[in-house]
Amino acid sequence: MTQWYPASPALWQGRDDSIEAPDARRLFQTVTRSETFSPENWQQKIALMGFACDEGVKRNAGRPGAAGAPDALRKALANMASHQGHERLVDLGNWVAPTPDLEGAQQALRDAVSRCLRAGMRTLVLGGGHETAFGHGAGVLDAFAQESVGIINLDAHLDLRQTDRATSGTPFRQLAQLCDAQSRAFHYACFGVSRAANTQALWREAQWRNVTVVEDLDCHDALAQMTQFIDKVDKIYLTIDLDVLPVWEMPAVSAPAALGVPLIQVLRLIEPVCRSGKLQAADLVEFNPRFDEDGAAARVAARLGWQIAHWWR
C-alpha cells in the first residue's frame, strides 16, 4: 500500500542571510512544511508533493533511481533565494510507492492531486519516473471534469507506448484512454520530441490522437504553437521530463538526450504557460540522483521548479 510521509525538516536547510535585510530570505525560510496531508487548510497555495516511485522506469527497462529524486530536489531548492510566488509553496510530503504496486501508487497520487485541486490549491509534483504523469494528470481530469484540460509535455519521448501494463512510457496513452472513457477530448502537446528516440508506430499513434508535436530541432521557434495550444483549453497540466534537456545539462536521467532542448529554450517555452492563468498542475520527472555526481543536475532541475513557482499566475 502506498504510504504518505511528511518531508523531513532536515531537507529544508540553507544559508541564513536575514541579518542583511528582512527580505534576504531563501526558500528554506519561506516554504511551509506540513506535518499532515491537509490541503483543505491551504487554499490558494501551491502543494509541493513528492512521488517517490520508479517502478514504471524499471518496467520500461530504464535506469532506476528516480524514487530518490523528490528529496534530492528539495535539498537543491532549499538554498535558492525566495522571490515573489515562493511564499505560496506548502510542502505536503511524499507519496512512497512499494515495489511493485505502481497502479496503487498512481491511484494514491490521483486521489491526492484531485483533493488538492478541489480544495483550491495547485500542485507541483516532484517525481519519480514519468509514470508520475498518469496519476497526476488523472487527478487533474477528475478535478476539472466539466472543463477542457490541456496536457503539455516537454519530453524527448511521446510516451504513448502500448504495453500490457503501465510503465514510464505509457502515461499519455493511459490519459488518452481515460479521456475516451469519460467521453472528453484528449488535448495533448509534446515539445522537444526526438525523432531518433520514437518509433514510427509512436508517431502514427500521435498523429491518430491529433497530438501537437514539436521536434527538438524546432523548439527554438515554437512559441506560436505553444500559444495556440494554451488558447484552446480551459485548464493546463504541465509535465517536464528532464530528459528533454541535452545530456551536457542533464546527465542524471534514465535516458539522456544526445541533442535535447537547452534549458534557456525550455524556460522560454514554459513562461507563457505559467503566466496564462490556466496552469493548475505541474511536475518535474525522471531526475535520477544516482547519476548526479556533484549536485549540478539537481540544481538544473530545481531551477525549473523555482521558475515555475515564481511565474505561476
Swiss-Prot record:
Mn(2+) 2 binds at residues 155, 157, 241, 243. It comes from the Bacteria. One of its GO terms (biological process) is putrescine biosynthetic process from arginine, via agmatine. GO terms for molecular function: agmatinase activity; formimidoylglutamase activity; manganese ion binding. CDD domains: Formimidoylglutamase. Its EC number is 3.5.3.8. Binds 2 manganese ions per subunit. Mn(2+) 1 binds at residues 130, 155, 159, 241. InterPro entries: HutG, Ureohydrolase, Ureohydrolase_dom_sf. Pfam families: Arginase. Keywords: Histidine metabolism, Hydrolase, Manganese, Metal-binding. Pathway: Amino-acid degradation; L-histidine degradation into L-glutamate; L-glutamate from N-formimidoyl-L-glutamate (hydrolase route): step 1/1. Its cofactor is Mn(2+). The keyword Hydrolase applies. Belongs to the arginase family. This is Formimidoylglutamase. The gene is hutG.
